[in-house]
Amino acid sequence: MDTINTHQQHVIGLDFGSDSVRALIVNAETGQEVSSSVVYYSRWMKGLYCQPAQSQFRHHPQDYLDAMTSAIQEVLATVPQTLADSVVGIGVDTTGSTPAPIDENGTVLALLPEFEHNPNAMFVLWKDHTSVAKADRINELAHSGKFTDYTRYVGGVYSSEWFWAKAAWVSEQDEQVAKRAFSWVELCDWIPAILADTQHPQKLRRGICAAGHKAMWHESWGGLPEQAFLSAISPTLDGIRDRMFTEVFTSDQAAGYLSKAWAIKLGLPEGIAIAIGEFDCHMGAVGAGAGANDLVKVIGTSTCDILMVESQNVGDRTIHGICGQVEGSAMPELLALEAGQSAFGDMYAWFKNVLMWPLQAYAEHNPDFALTAEEIASELLPMLSQAAEQQGIDQYTPVAMDWLNGRRTPYANQRLKGAICDLNLGSSSPAIFSALVESTAHGAKAIVDCFIEQDVTVERVIAIGGIAQKSPYVMQMCADVIGRDIIVVESDQCCALGAAIFAAVAAGVYPTTKSAQAVMASPVRQTYSPTPKVQTLRAQRYATYRELGQHMEQIAEFHQSQEREDV
């Protein structure tokens, strides 16, 4: 650990991911990342409350509270008490849209004894796609001409991954939850409210990030969609607009201040600033040092892509096929355009699991082999990457479609499925893996093209996250396929770093996010540049990818038509 200056001000960034929460201590005056701790969600790691085959993924709220408490306590245990006393603020980022039903006191229903083990009373994780039918209903209503097109600023297509689809679907599936739910809350708004003891619906401050990108909040129509529209989505939403919110805030503002109870529990000073929460990818862009016309790809199990632009360069235009354009949802002074891929690292994990199945099955009946199987599992993806890189890609390499978890961007459609084509008896595991990696790079290129085709400037592409740090093969593939430099920054915890930057601003250490970012954001680690000699082949294979996508869309439409006939 570097020398620690305990006389300077420090902040904590909390990054709530799909599997774990990370707590990062940062020197607010130098940007030094002092120490961090990661704690996994115990119930989630046991697979509780989830049904992957039905795309149901739920998080118990107690998992978040337990893991957050442990992570902060653990990270503070690594530094002197004088440093803990110098912490002046906490920033929070989370996955999203990850909403949950709350009662009239702001308590998530699963924290009540009668709902403790009810998945419908928990947080509905971002990748839960059980509400596809409700997303279809929202799109139908928004484009019917009977209402304002509330999808205008979320790319023109509402996703089953988002707030209102999930709230409506869960409420229709569970009468008891629908009756008890006073309102709904996003995880990124709930955590700051818990820390500040402002979770009561009348006190709870909501961030513009979640409201604008996922709940169709926009000032041009007075905030949230009108009640008649919400009721048309589902009668279970009757009256909910008055129980939601009318005001939103950017993350350079305080959601509240650390309560006495939480200060004692965590070992931090009472009354320190708690910044307004934001989604992980937005704070990751800030932590990566991004500014106007920089596209930041937060690469993990999926990707979330943030492109920030000057508002006047977009004007009154709406950018189609993306996940929203919201003023101030990342850097407060810039318009943030959100996109993303529903599966990235999950594609590689799926293939790994397919290859490992016979070894794991054998290990179940031969315990002595279990350790060997674990060793193979830990080395499998690096071995595949090395072999795939050595073999390279040519016109005979299989072509894959990266929609194993649906398509987020361009034009959200969670009914779509993945595919691998052009297989033959000579297709090897490395060749198939290469096709899967290429497909995720193709998906990344489709997002860049979606912006450029609508006259939105993309100057730099910045990649953050574990895959960006650990897989040169994947990053070089992305550079070759997209045809642009891919910048990888030094920090391996940019989302938590972005949260820490906002904590510093909310605490008054800096007057603006831009001035805080100039000191605290991560420097560049390395740049991957396109390989000139492969560009012609890449263009040909991307054209094949696009054609395969059209076929997969037709298959999805066929399946949907069959479902309608069966009803």
From Swiss-Prot:
GO cellular component, one term: cytoplasm
GO BP terms: L-arabinose catabolic process to xylulose 5-phosphate
Keywords assigned by UniProt, alphabetized: Arabinose catabolism, ATP-binding, Carbohydrate metabolism, Kinase, Nucleotide-binding, Transferase
Class of this enzyme: transferase
E.C. no: 2.7.1.16
Pathway: Carbohydrate degradation; L-arabinose degradation via L-ribulose; D-xylulose 5-phosphate from L-arabinose (bacterial route): step 2/3
UniProt xrefs under Pfam families: FGGY_C (PF02782), FGGY_N (PF00370)
Superkingdom, taxonomy of origin: Bacteria
Reaction equations catalysed: D-ribulose + ATP = D-ribulose 5-phosphate + ADP + H(+); L-ribulose + ATP = L-ribulose 5-phosphate + ADP + H(+)
A GO MF label: ATP binding
CDD domains to which the protein is assigned, alphabetical: ASKHA_NBD_FGGY_L-RBK
Cross-referenced InterPro entries: ATPase_NBD, Carb_kinase_FGGY, FGGY_C, FGGY_N, Ribulokinase
Family membership: Belongs to the ribulokinase family.
Protein name: Ribulokinase
Species of provenance: Vibrio parahaemolyticus serotype O3:K6 (strain RIMD 2210633)
Gene name of the record: araB
